[in-house]
């Protein structure tokens, strides 16, 4: 058998881009995209449009070459969905950028990525133009205006001098007979994503065609995605490419419901109007939906995948009483999205709701296509006991792990170590049943008098208080103890403005549920906690505030 070697017929590079060809054949007349502006496309039309954009990108007028970076600054609109396919189909590397970044941060990313072309949403024109003004002339990318909400797709006189064309104009240059450019190897870079920067400066994460394929197929299998679901885009497409569901929805012929607005009234309205079956949502979005004053149980259940910050069991429990069936995953930008999920066991169905929610708040086990997950002592590299108590750093190994950080070999070597593991920087435990539970970011662990305190554990208790809307716990420097827990809290209010609670009452609430050393010494009330656009609470800002407190 040793003479049987790989052959071109059995070693075609893995890529998700072929999902679109198949969708056009199998689901051609089925709706692919719905938009709140009444835009409706079929999978045949989406296939045609993506090929035309890819063709135009490679034309002499735009001149994008294989391996060059093309950026997208926009919300969850149809054109942004199409670009997830069209850009890599042209042989270019797709770079989605958070549209809520300021001009300085945006210019840093554009310069670092050496982006040659940027597709810009109308709401981001001013910030992108300011960002480009900070760049040297030879660094400046061409700009194309996304025109999802415009009728004729023509450039206005005011935009004509800054933009090369509109999205519709670029499409009209393209050829739907274009043979899209397949990767030469499955290790070829496909995606450049920047980390959200909740703890430090963003890093450029490079993901291969193989990584995206492995992530997407595993996600579909793990979530038991059916054919032709209706998927609501509440998760930003710029956030790890919507955890791979940008391509996964094509594989199953889903209807993608796009929306600019992600607020409770809009989400409930779209769920009802379009009979939504699936959506992804950060814990912040679940919290928002469960606290909406006009909330009422859903007519039909909606499958929700949540990931990001560890979701408190109380939020999961409240969401499920409304008809949201919550699944829970864990991953990072560096893994392309969730690679661990809380695989449900039938015997858990008979437990009481709070116990089910507690189990579901754990991150779980590796997804089907991922290789290994462990918790190890970062100093020795040895596995910790699987007892639900012994804490270590979460380490990962599998096909969807990044190629590395762009232009950052030192940063890459620091997390992709010689022992063959990717070190996540997250702290967790593994329970006796083999299920992972994330306890904290390593930077979020509070060391009080030599004892390690999981901020997530304290936050979980705070979220069980009926008047607490949001909670985050950080370290506050202390001369005697080194660090003590400091809680930042926002509160719920009823129609009469009731819901006020004192710092003492919050601390007393915690004292009955936590060891004394874990009880917050300080509680700060805020109207709303600072968050990234993907819903993660910006603890580095809260840590700075805590340092200045008396």
Curated annotation (Swiss-Prot):
Q: In which tissues is it expressed?
A: Expressed in leaves, flowers and developing seeds.
Alphabetized InterPro entries for the sequence: AMP-bd_C, AMP-bd_C_sf, AMP-binding_CS, AMP-dep_synth/lig_dom, ANL_N_sf, EF_Hand_1_Ca_BS
Q: Does the keyword Phosphoprotein apply?
A: no
Keyword annotations for this protein, in alphabetical order, are:
Fatty acid metabolism, Ligase, Lipid metabolism
User: Is this entry keyworded Ligase?
Assistant: yes
Q: Which residues cross the membrane?
A: none
Stated EC number for the protein is 6.2.1.-
PROSITE patterns, per this entry? AMP_BINDING, EF_HAND_1
- Could you tell me which SUPFAM superfamilies the record lists for this protein? Acetyl-CoA synthetase-like
Give an example GO molecular function: ligase activity
Q: Which domain of life is it from?
A: Eukaryota
BP-aspect Gene Ontology terms: fatty acid metabolic process
Entry function = May act as an acid--thiol ligase that activates carboxylic acids by forming acyl-CoAs.
Family designation:
Belongs to the ATP-dependent AMP-binding enzyme family.
Protein's name according to its UniProt entry: Probable acyl-activating enzyme 9
The species is Arabidopsis thaliana (Mouse-ear cress)
């Amino acid at each position: 058998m040793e003479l049987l070697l790989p052959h071109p017929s059995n070693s075609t590079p893995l890529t998700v881009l072929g999902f679109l060809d198949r969708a056009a054949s199998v689901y051609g007349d089925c709706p692919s995209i719905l938009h709140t502006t009444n835009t409706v496309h079929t999978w045949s039309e989406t296939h045609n449009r993506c090929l035309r954009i890819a063709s135009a990108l490679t034309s002499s007028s735009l001149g994008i070459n294989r391996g060059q970076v093309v950026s997208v600054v926009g919300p969850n609109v149809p054109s942004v969905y199409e670009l997830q396919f069209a850009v890599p189909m042209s042989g270019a590397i797709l770079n989605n950028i958070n549209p809520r970044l300021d001009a300085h941060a945006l210019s840093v990313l554009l310069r670092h990525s050496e982006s040659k072309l940027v597709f810009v949403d109308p709401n981001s024109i001013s910030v992108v133009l300011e960002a480009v003004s900070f760049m040297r002339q030879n660094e400046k990318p061409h700009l194309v205006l996304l025109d999802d909400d415009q009728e004729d797709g023509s450039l206005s006189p005011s935009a004509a001098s800054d933009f090369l064309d509109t999205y519709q104009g670029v499409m009209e240059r393209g050829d739907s007979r274009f043979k899209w450019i397949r990767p030469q190897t499955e290790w070829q870079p496909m995606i450049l994503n920047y980390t959200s920067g909740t703890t430090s400066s963003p890093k450029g994460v490079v993901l291969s065609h193989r990584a995206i394929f492995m992530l997407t197929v595993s996600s579909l299998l793990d979530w038991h995605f059916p054919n032709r679901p209706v998927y609501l885009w509440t998760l930003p497409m710029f956030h790890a490419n919507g955890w791979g569901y940008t391509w996964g929805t094509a594989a199953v012929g889903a209807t993608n419901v796009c929306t600019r607005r992600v607020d409770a009234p809009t989400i409930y309205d779209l769920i009802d109007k379009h009979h939504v079956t699936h959506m992804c949502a950060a814990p912040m979005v679940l919290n928002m939906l469960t606290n909406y004053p006009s909330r009422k149980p859903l007519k039909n259940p909606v499958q929700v995948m949540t990931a990001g910050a560890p979701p408190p069991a109380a939020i999961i429990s409240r969401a499920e009483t409304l008809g949201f069936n919550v699944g829970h995953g864990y991953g990072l930008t560096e893994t392309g999205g969730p690679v661990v999920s809380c695989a449900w066991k039938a015997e858990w169905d008979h437990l009481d709701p709070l116990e089910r929610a507690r189990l579901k708040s754990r991150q779980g086990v590796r997804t089907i296509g991922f290789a290994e997950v462990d918790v190890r002592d970062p100093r020795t590299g040895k596995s910790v006991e699987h007892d639900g108590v012994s804490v270590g750093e979460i380490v990962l190994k599998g096909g969807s792990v990044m190629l590395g950080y762009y232009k950052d070999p030192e940063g890459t070597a620091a997390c992709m170590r010689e022992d063959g593991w990717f070190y996540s920087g997250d702290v967790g435990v593994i329970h006796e049943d083999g299920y992972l539970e994330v306890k904290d970011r390593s930077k979020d662990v509070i060391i009080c008098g030599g004892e390690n305190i999981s901020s997530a554990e304290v936050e979980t208790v705070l979220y069980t208080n009926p008047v607490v809307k949001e909670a985050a716990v950080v370290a506050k420097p202390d001369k005697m103890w080194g660090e003590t827990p400091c809680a930042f809290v926002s509160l719920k209010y009823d129609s009469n403005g009731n819901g006020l609670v004192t710092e003492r009452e919050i601390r007393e609430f915690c004292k009955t549920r936590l060891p004394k050393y874990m009880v917050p010494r300080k509680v700060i009330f805020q109207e709303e906690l600072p968050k990234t656009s993907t819903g993660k609470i910006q603890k580095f800002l809260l840590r700075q505030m805590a340092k200045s407190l008396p």
